[in-house]
Amino acid sequence: YQIEYEGLPQGVPVLNKSQKEEILEIPEVVSASFYRMRDYADGIYYQDKSMDGGKVLGIDSDYLDTCGYQLVRGRGFNQKEYANFKKVALLDETAANSFFEKGEELGKTIEIKGEPFVVVGVVKKSDEYEPVINSIEEYYTYYNDESGIVMITDSVWPVVYQYDEPQQAVIQTKTPEDMSQAGKAVQQILNEQIQNTETSVSYKAEDIMEKAKGLQQI
């Protein structure tokens, strides 16, 4: 579902803390995160350089750990930045390389939809969360849309995009074998809150490249 093209879906409420707590009570689940995403983001600039086609994520404080990210340089977001709607950003290495020489990212100001965001950190997926690529087909499966990722706090997301956008969820499970069962349980929890039962929009568990490392995308 592409919000930027189709608008906000009807009857899909914003996910809340109680739902995350319910998800964390699933025996197979280790951690969980709710986030928002623009799958194809334009309007991202540093001076005269632009990044088109990358992703922008509005993340909660659990996202980096749940998805296996580690800091390369700088720091992650702190609670004051979430609470005070600070315009700060994290870049993955691909996005960082689009704008800066290595090591020159921190403290620089990029623009997202005309709003200034200060880069506070550069992140990458931990090696244990990266897939082993054995063929060109697998490469395109995992990396064909890897044009860079910019992360901002979920609290400041409406400054750039829209209020009350539906979130996505990701969980980490104890073992890869737990993914299917846990994913279905999370899917049920999230869909219980959808008010418009006739809508074509619902949450559905989806296997992504992290499935080999105990992650499940919702």
State the predicted function of each range:
Residues G214-Q217:
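Internal alpha-helical transmembrane segments of multi-pass membrane proteins, especially GPCRs
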Residues E4-V14, Y46-S50, V122-S126, I171-M179, ...:
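Structural beta->alpha junctions
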Residues I3-Y5, I23, V29-A32, L64, ...:
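Generic structural signal for small/hydrophobic residues in well-ordered secondary structure
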Residues Y1-Y45, S50-D60, Y142-N144, E165-Q167:
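Membrane-proximal extracellular/periplasmic loop immediately following the first transmembrane helix
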Residues E22, I26, S98, A185, ...:
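Structured segments of extracytoplasmic/periplasmic soluble domains
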Residues K49-V160, D164:
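Hydrophobic secondary-structure segments that place a key small or acidic residue at a functional site
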Residues Y143-A212:
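"Rare, low-scoring activations can occur
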Residues S33, T109-E111, V170:
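Residues embedded in well-ordered beta-strands within globular domains across many folds
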